[in-house]
Design a protein with these regions (language model features):
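N-terminal secretory signal peptides that target proteins for export/translocation
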Residues: 1-5
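Bacterial N-terminal signal peptides
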Residues: 10-19
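N-terminal secretory signal peptides
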Residues: 24-79
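Short strand-turn-strand beta-turns centered on an Asx-Gly dipeptide
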Residues: 155-158
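Cysteine/selenocysteine-centered motifs that mediate thiol-based redox chemistry or coordinate metal-sulfur cofactors
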Residues: 185-201
Length: 201
């Protein structure tokens, strides 16, 4: 497919830019991800960032922030301290449909026990998504984990879900992008700070 190589190259650049640019922000399709942020009084660093594609279309840009670098899903989930997943839409999408896609992403990557543990947050996420008609380019979805506080989901900067004190909801949300059946395999590799492999199917 002719679109695969440019896409892989773009995502590889997304991974390498922090190394090449030092302390400069990573710019993906006009969305800037700062190399460091503060969350709950803790300094977090950009672990990786990339773009979610559907066919040739850019759907959203996403960045993962952790206290220290992690290159595997297990390491991300086990990492101590605060964590943030920040998503910025690059096109208009039906909010209710987006909520269903996220819920399906959780279900596709969670065990039955994990899904049940995260169910209160999943149900509230569905309720929250129904309050919005559309999400447009520039709108944000942010999932934050703060030890002692729990997981909170923000839509357009507004707290909509949580906080849930147990890590189950954050882990379930993280697996949408980092699980065995992620939303986008190349995006998963970018978030984990890995050079994306070219995909031929």
């Amino acid at each position: 497919m002719p679109t695969l190589l440019p896409r892989a190259a773009a995502l590889t650049l997304a991974v390498l830019m922090p190394l090449l640019a030092g302390a400069q922000a990573v710019d993906l399709a006009g969305v800037k991800f700062e190399p460091q942020i503060m969350l709950g009084g803790q300094a977090l660093q950009l672990n990786g960032a990339g773009i979610r594609y559907k066919a040739i279309f850019k759907v959203y840009a996403a960045g993962l922030y952790l206290a220290s670098k992690a290159s595997t899903t297990d390491a991300v989930l086990a990492a101590p301290g605060a964590k943030r997943i920040h998503v910025v839409l690059l096109r208009t999408i039906d909010a209710n449909e987006f909520g269903k896609i996220l819920s399906a992403g959780i279900q596709n990557n969670a065990t039955r026990e994990e899904f049940i543990a995260a169910l209160p947050g999943i149900q509230r996420m569905g309720e929250a998504s129904s309050q919005y008609k559309q999400l447009v380019a520039g709108d944000t979805l942010t999932v934050e984990w703060l030890p002692g506080t729990g997981t909170t989901l923000y839509v357009k900067g507004k707290s909509e879900v949580g906080p849930y004190k147990e890590p189950a909801f954050f882990n379930a949300m993280a697996k949408i992008w980092l699980g065995k059946s992620p939303a986008d395999h190349l995006l998963k590799e970018a978030l984990l700070g890995q050079a994306p492999r070219r995909q031929d199917n």
